[in-house]
């Protein structure tokens, strides 16, 4: 009924496609609002490629790891604020106006970034974009949910998620398209202004959410919109259902004025639900997904691929697999169950992280040696190499670690043969490239680089259908109805904060302890996540909220995660009940 988000399955998506001729108004509404999800994905994905060229234009960014992390992570800081403020704006001014405000922030941020003359201005633009991301992450799915027919609501809300991953994939394509255009990263970051402006125009032609209008006492406007959304024979039933649902919400809100965090934690079902919901959101980030999404081209370069363009091209694999995994999750999440799917996902993530750890260990311990003859061929030797007491023992990694000012020019005959350790600047890079040599300033030439690509691909293949989707689904099912808003907000905030911590620390960790050791940390965290899921996360597939509450109240360990839970088995026919 009205107010709940029905689960999306394959049949719902087939019916969703039929809207293109049955009710194009609903599809136009969902796609127009879904541009917010697309912008969310684009602006979080585009920085991974743009960062490669920002480093080339701003020397201080190239030499200061914390500045690179700040450019990436300040959008996340903005998103935390945007999500917090967005909830109030959604309720006070409506879903439609919230989306337009988010678009305005996207537009301003894109223009500021595209015209930035220094890193500080670039960071300001990233904060603006982050504010838009935070608001869009709440407003777009909420608008789609409240203005969609019940039977296809789950599919249309899932469409927003697909547009997020689609936006990330397109950002990699656009990054690749602008690699040979003067201004490179300015175009990459500025392009987001176009869909933002497009959405403002489209939203001006669409109505407000009927649920919000009902809550504000504007019932006639809401009824008029519902007549456009539903077939004539269903309109009156939906109007009555919406009215009852809103009245119930108002009553529950009136009884929830004095809810505090301490009161929540004293309630066993809520406390255990928060353990599961928050834990899944935190582990989703701490197993390293956004190091792959934000720094994928950089990771590819660390694996031994020198060219920015090649790094972007190879990173398309991860973005494409992420989008594909989101589609797969629609099928597997109901066939497999939440708990089993997330455990299988995490086990696969462990395997892929082991591959990455081994590959980067081999890459760093078997890098090409530095040749005195090759180095003396150029006139700008790295000062550290000149002062070294044992230059004959230097290899490529020693050269790169000696100073951010040093780089490695590979041998022309074979990049795995001894090369030159030189001062890293544009002139040196040009001289190196003129002699048909490859220039390395991030990673070193390696015969194992292609294995790193396999590791990244495996990571996304295992992560996306399970850990990419399940935390959000479980958080929509596990809390008592009265506390769902506040608990969902707490869990969502924990996700953004964890995301910020990982994004702000990844490059610093790789510099301090090495890339292989950094991925090893993610292995330990993922193993901890597996143990956490076994102990704290129940199976919520197909359970009504009353059954979920009872299960949390009497929770006991079930190590046989591959078996269907007793509660789930008891209610197979209740799968589509509102939770």
Stretches found by the model and what they are:
Residues 1-230, 247-579:
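Alpha-helical transmembrane bundle of multi-pass membrane proteins
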Residues 235-247:
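Short, well-structured alpha-helical segments
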């Amino acid at each position: 009924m009205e107010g709940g988000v029905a689960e999306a399955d394959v049949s719902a998506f087939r019916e969703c496609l039929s809207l293109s001729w049955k009710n194009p108004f609903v599809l136009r509404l969902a796609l127009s609002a879904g541009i917010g999800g697309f912008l969310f994905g684009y602006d979080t994905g585009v920085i991974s490629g743009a960062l490669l060229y920002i480093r080339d234009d701003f020397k201080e960014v190239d030499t200061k790891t914390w500045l690179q992390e700040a450019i990436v992570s300040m959008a996340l800081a903005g998103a935390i604020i945007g999500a917090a403020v967005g909830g109030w704006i959604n309720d006070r001014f409506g879903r439609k106006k919230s989306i337009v405000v988010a678009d305005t922030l996207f537009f301003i941020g894109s223009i500021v970034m595209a015209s930035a003359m220094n890193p500080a201005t670039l960071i300001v633009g990233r904060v603006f974009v982050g504010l838009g991301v935070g608001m869009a992450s709440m407003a777009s799915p909420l608008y789609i949910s409240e203005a969609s027919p019940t039977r296809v609501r789950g599919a249309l809300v899932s469409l927003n998620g697909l547009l997020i991953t689609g936006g990330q994939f397109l950002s990699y394509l656009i990054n690749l398209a602008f690699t040979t255009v003067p201004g490179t990263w300015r175009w990459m970051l500025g392009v987001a202004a176009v869909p933002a402006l497009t959405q403002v125009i489209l939203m001006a032609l669409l109505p407000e959410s009927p649920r919000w209008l009902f809550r504000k006492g504007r019932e006639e406007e809401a009824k008029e919109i519902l007549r456009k959304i539903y077939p004539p024979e269903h309109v009156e039933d939906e109007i009555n259902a919406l009215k009852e649902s809103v009245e119930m919400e108002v009553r529950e809100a009136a009884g929830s004025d004095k809810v505090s965090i301490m009161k929540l934690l004293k309630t066993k079902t809520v406390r255990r639900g928060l353990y599961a919901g928050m834990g899944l959101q935190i582990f989703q980030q701490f197993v390293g997904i956004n190091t792959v999404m934000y720094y994928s081209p950089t990771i590819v370069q660390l694996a031994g691929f020198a060219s920015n363009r090649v790094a972007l091209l190879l990173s398309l694999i991860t973005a494409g697999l992420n989008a594909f995994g989101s589609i797969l999750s629609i099928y597997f999440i109901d066939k497999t169950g939440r708990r089993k799917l997330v455990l299988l996902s995490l086990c696969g993530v462990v395997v892929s992280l082991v591959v990455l750890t081994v590959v980067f260990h081999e890459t760093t311990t078997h890098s090409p040696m530095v040749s005195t003859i090759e180095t003396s061929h150029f006139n700008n030797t790295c000062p550290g190499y000149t002062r070294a007491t044992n230059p004959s023992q230097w290899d490529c990694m020693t050269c790169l670690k000696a100073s951010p000012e040093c780089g490695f020019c590979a041998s022309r005959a074979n990049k795995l043969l001894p090369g030159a350790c030189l001062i890293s600047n544009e002139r040196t890079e040009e001289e190196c490239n003129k002699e048909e040599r490859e220039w390395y300033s991030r990673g070193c030439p390696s015969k194992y680089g292609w294995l790193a690509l396999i590791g990244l691909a495996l990571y996304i293949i295992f992560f996306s259908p399970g850990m990419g989707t399940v935390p959000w689904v479980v958080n929509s099912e596990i809390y008592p109805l009265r506390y769902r808003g506040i608990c969902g907000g707490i869990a969502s905030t924990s996700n953004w904060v964890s995301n910020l911590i990982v994004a702000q620390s990844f490059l610093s960790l790789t510099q301090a302890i090495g890339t292989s050791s950094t991925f090893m940390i993610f292995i330990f965290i993922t193993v901890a996540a597996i143990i956490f899921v076994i102990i704290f996360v129940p199976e919520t597939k197909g359970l009504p909220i009353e059954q979920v509450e009872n299960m949390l109240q009497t929770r006991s360990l079930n190590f046989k995660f591959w078996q269907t839970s007793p509660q789930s088995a008891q209610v197979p026919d209740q799968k589509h009940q509102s939770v």
